[in-house]
């Protein structure tokens, strides 16, 4: 597998709709001149933004978290330009960008150093060949203090790896349960 460059990312986004909306360069400031956490195309990846809808874990119902029988009441919905994650807690968000992953590509998501250096960890499982949708982002606040996530700014980086041959069975072929997700998507069993 080979990691793909900015040229390949731009070509696939602009000619094949792999990322929408797409930013061909790296954005560091708003049109008004305000600094933002960078997003857009980088040397060997694409920095994604998160939307304004968040789900924050709460212990109001004192439920046990079970991925096979998940209780949506374990979350509080938040909509806004920022999300404050309580100490040692967790939140979900989604990317503004919609992805269409080619059949011979696997995409890995890593957190941005700006957040990692503040104790905020981003976790996303790989975007498999022929998966498409908005990515549900998982944020963990590992600190003893509240942590802030900024909507419409960079939160994670996608790296694209191209195989030397297409996979035998893609995510679309097997009817993956998160295909076409749009917005924050909770666990499905």
Curated annotation (Swiss-Prot):
Function: Catalyzes the deamination of dCTP to dUTP.
Single biological process term from Gene Ontology: nucleobase-containing small molecule interconversion
Entry annotation: catalytic residues: 138
NCBIfam families: dCTP_deam (TIGR02274)
The organism's place on the tree of life at top rank: Bacteria
HAMAP family in the record: dCTP_deaminase (MF_00146)
Enzyme class, spelled out: hydrolase
Keyword Oxidoreductase annotated: no
Catalytic activity entry: dCTP + H2O + H(+) = dUTP + NH4(+)
Gene3D superfamilies: 2.70.40.10
UniProt entry tagged with the keyword Electron transport: no
A single GO molecular function term of this UniProt record: dCTP deaminase activity
EC number(s) stated in the UniProt entry for this protein: 3.5.4.13
Binding-site list for dCTP: 112-117, 136-138, 157, 171, 181
Keywords, in A-Z order: Hydrolase, Nucleotide metabolism, Nucleotide-binding
Subunit structure: Homotrimer.
Pathway involvement of the protein, from the record: Pyrimidine metabolism; dUMP biosynthesis; dUMP from dCTP (dUTP route): step 1/2
Protein family (similarity comment): Belongs to the dCTP deaminase family.
Protein name: dCTP deaminase
Species: Halorhodospira halophila (strain DSM 244 / SL1) (Ectothiorhodospira halophila (strain DSM 244 / SL1))
InterPro entries recorded: dCTP_deaminase, dUTPase-like_sf, dUTPase_trimeric
């Amino acid at each position: 597998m080979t990691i793909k460059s900015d040229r390949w990312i731009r070509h696939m986004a602009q000619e094949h709709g792999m990322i929408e909306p797409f930013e061909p360069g790296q954005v560091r400031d708003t049109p008004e001149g305000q600094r933002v956490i960078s997003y857009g195309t980088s040397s060997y990846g694409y920095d994604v933004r998160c939307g304004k809808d968040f789900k924050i874990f709460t212990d109001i119902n004192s439920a046990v978290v079970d991925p096979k029988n998940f209780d949506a009441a374990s979350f509080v919905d938040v909509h806004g330009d920022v999300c404050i994650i309580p100490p040692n807690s967790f939140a979900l968000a989604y990317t503004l960008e919609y992805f269409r992953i080619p059949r011979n590509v696997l995409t890995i998501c890593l957190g941005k150093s700006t957040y990692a250096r503040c104790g905020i960890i981003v976790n996303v499982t790989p975007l498999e060949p022929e998966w498409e949708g908005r990515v549900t982002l998982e944020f963990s606040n590992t600190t003893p203090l509240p942590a802030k996530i900024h909507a419409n700014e960079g939160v994670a980086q996608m790296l694209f790896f191209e195989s030397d041959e297409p996979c035998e069975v893609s995510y679309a072929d097997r009817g993956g349960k998160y295909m076409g997700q749009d917005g924050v998507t909770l666990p499905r069993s």
